[in-house]
Every structure is written in structure tokens, then in C-alpha cells.
């Protein structure tokens, strides 16, 4: 069977819970790794230079800072974020259509000023740590979790951005409404038998790809492994 995609290009490794030295040691052990995710923890620890350092090592960067503020602030933040060269940048869909539009317009401007292609902006719908019961009880939102995800994905699409972040459990329905090239990127990925940690809405890698995920965010299954290369290659093999 000939694959229509490269398995390694479907996986984004979350670089959480590590120092800069540990990040670079891990990267050296993963020659087939293409995508890395820089989240709030690593960005706060090391600043924007970590993105340049990862790109210098040939990695594509998913900058997952989940910007959520008034439109002007979101625009200014995404303008600066785009100048780092990150290929993917997240905003919260709950920031609203105006905020997302301003973020997208400013990101395009920032990238252009430094001679880079514009990043893809992705809207976070509902965090995968939320379960349906907690979602209603704690936030008081009288919508089902699925309904809320659909509403926010539609908002993101109407704002003109390139995709959204959702759990793998919502992907199949969203993919029917939003065909490629709209990106559906999914955390909450665990191979069979792996600890689910703080995720609630999960699937295996192959299940998520079959459901319509564009890319999968993986983390502790690789970063906590005694042999990260074997763990990464094992996940890749599950997609073949």
C-alpha cells in the first residue's frame, strides 16, 4: 500500500516539562522528528529564541500560546509571534471573530515584514482536559460539549483562519463540515495501554487519523520513554 502522507509529518511532539538542554538532547535522539510544539511553559522559560534554535535544527514549530485577549492585543501578539518563524500559532476561539481576524491579519503582516511565509492560525475550541460533566457544572454553559466545539469551529472558519484544535472525538463530525485543507489538529492522543494522564477525550493515533485529524499532538509517550526514538518510531508505525 502506498501512503498518501508521511507518518512523521502527522506527529507534533510537545516539548513540555523540560529544560533547554533536555530539549536539545531529546531532539538529537529523534532524527525523523519534523514538528515540535512550544507551549506556555517552555516559551516562558526560554523566550522566543527557543523557536529560532529549534528551526536552526531543522524543526517546524507549532507555537501553542493560545492567545486570548482583546482584538488589539491579540493582533500585536500574533504580529510578533509570526516574526519568529513559527509555522502554526494558536488563539482561543472564545476570543471572538474580531479578535481572530485581527490576529490573522497581523500575523500575515509580521511574517511578510521579515520575509517569511505567513503562519497558519489555529483556533482552540474546547481543551481536551474538559469532560462533558465538568464542562456544564463548572462553566455553566448550557450546551453539550460537542455543540460548543462545533460552534467555535464555525466561528474560526468564518474568521478566515486555517484550522482549529479539538479532541479526536470531535474530528469526524467536524471533518464533514470542514474538508481539507482546513486543519484539524488533535491532542489527546494515546497508544493502547498508555496512561491518559490529564486528558479526558482521547483516541489512538490511527483512530484519530482515520477520523480526519490533520496532525496529532503527542508528548509524554515519547518524552518520558527510556528510548524516545523507539517510542516515536512505534507511533509512526501505527499510522502505516
From Swiss-Prot:
One of its GO terms (biological process) is 'de novo' pyrimidine nucleobase biosynthetic process. Pfam families: OMPdecase. InterPro entries: Aldolase_TIM, OMPdecase, OMPdecase_AS, OMPdecase_bac, OMPdeCOase_dom, RibuloseP-bd_barrel. It catalyses: orotidine 5'-phosphate + H(+) = UMP + CO2. It comes from the Bacteria. PANTHER family: OROTIDINE 5'-PHOSPHATE DECARBOXYLASE. This is Orotidine 5'-phosphate decarboxylase. It comes from Prochlorococcus marinus (strain SARG / CCMP1375 / SS120). The lineage of its organism: Bacteria, Bacillati, Cyanobacteriota, Cyanophyceae, Synechococcales.
Amino acid at each position: 500500500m502506498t501512503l498518501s502522507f508521511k507518518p512523521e509529518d502527522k506527529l507534533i511532539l510537545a516539548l513540555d516539562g523540560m529544560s533547554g538542554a533536555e530539549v536539545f538532547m531529546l531532539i538529537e535522539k529523534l532524527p525523523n522528528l519534523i514538528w515540535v510544539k512550544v507551549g506556555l511553559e517552555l516559551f516562558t522559560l526560554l523566550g522566543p529564541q527557543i523557536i529560532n534554535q529549534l528551526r536552526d535544527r531543522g524543526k517546524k514549530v507549532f507555537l501553542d500560546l493560545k492567545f486570548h485577549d482583546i482584538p488589539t492585543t491579540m493582533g500585536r501578539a500574533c504580529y510578533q509571534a509570526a516574526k519568529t518563524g513559527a509555522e502554526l500559532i494558536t488563539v482561543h476561539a472564545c476570543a471572538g471573530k474580531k479578535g481572530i481576524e485581527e490576529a490573522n491579519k497581523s500575523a500575515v503582516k509580521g511574517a511578510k515584514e521579515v520575509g517569511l511565509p505567513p503562519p497558519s492560525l489555529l483556533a482552540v475550541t474546547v481543551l481536551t482536559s474538559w469532560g462533558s460533566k465538568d464542562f456544564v457544572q463548572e462553566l455553566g454553559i448550557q450546551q453539550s460539549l460537542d455543540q460548543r466545539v462545533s460552534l467555535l469551529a464555525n466561528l474560526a472558519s468564518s474568521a478566515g483562519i486555517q484550522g482549529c484544535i479539538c479532541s479526536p472525538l470531535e474530528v469526524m463530525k467536524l471533518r464533514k463540515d470542514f474538508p481539507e485543507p482546513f486543519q484539524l489538529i488533535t491532542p489527546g492522543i494515546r497508544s493502547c495501554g498508555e496512561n491518559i494522564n490529564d486528558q479526558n477525550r482521547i483516541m489512538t493515533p490511527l483512530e484519530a487519523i482515520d477520523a480526519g485529524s490533520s496532525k496529532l499532538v503527542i508528548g509524554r509517550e515519547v518524552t518520558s520513554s527510556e528510548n524516545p526514538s523507539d517510542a516515536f518510531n512505534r507511533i509512526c508505525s501505527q499510522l502505516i
